[in-house]
């Protein structure tokens, strides 16, 4: 199931729209694509650990996370919350009907 979440990349005081797309399908592994820097790539481990500590399960399937547009560099930890919500919604663990109505950014702790 494909989930789209709106967030933003901050450039100075300007917010440039970014879309986090999360898809869960047959296969294995977690893949992050879309010109993410090291901090964004590290967010996967932080996000997975935070979800597990809150009692959510990580599907034993292939999870693809795309940060669009693909031609724009993304940096920072503000993508943690959109990625986490995308995994929760795409795996069917919660119904999040208002997800598409808000721009979401935020960092997660491990707990």
Predicted regions and their residues:
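Peripheral, non-AAA+ core regions of ATP-driven protein-machinery
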Residues: 1-111
């Amino acid at each position: 199931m494909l989930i789209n979440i709106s967030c933003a990349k901050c450039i100075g005081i300007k917010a440039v729209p970014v879309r986090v797309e999360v898809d869960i399908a047959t296969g294995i592994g977690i893949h992050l694509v879309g010109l993410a820097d090291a901090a964004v790539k590290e967010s996967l481990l932080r996000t997975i650990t935070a979800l597990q500590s809150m009692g959510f399960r990580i599907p034993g399937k292939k999870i693809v996370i795309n940060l669009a547009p693909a031609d724009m560099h993304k940096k920072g930890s503000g993508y943690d919350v959109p990625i986490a919500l995308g995994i929760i919604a795409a795996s069917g663990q919660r119904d999040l009907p208002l997800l598409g109505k808000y721009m979401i950014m935020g960092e997660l702790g491990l707990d």
